[in-house]
């Protein structure tokens, strides 16, 4: 039975190395996903701010285009 221990130890060591390798890849993937999420959040915040400004500008344009007729100067007389 003592002769089987080195083989068993080698199998356990190989399994441990495989698990450590997988863990390393998982940690790398998690870091990459965290960075991608942070970038997406920044992009979303920038887009929300841009939309807010565009809606403000659109409101100003609408106010100008659809002002009350009372506020308009009279048409020229020919």
From Swiss-Prot:
Family, as annotated: Belongs to the SlyX family.
UniProt-listed HAMAP family: SlyX
Name of the protein described by the UniProt record: Protein SlyX homolog
Gene (UniProt): slyX
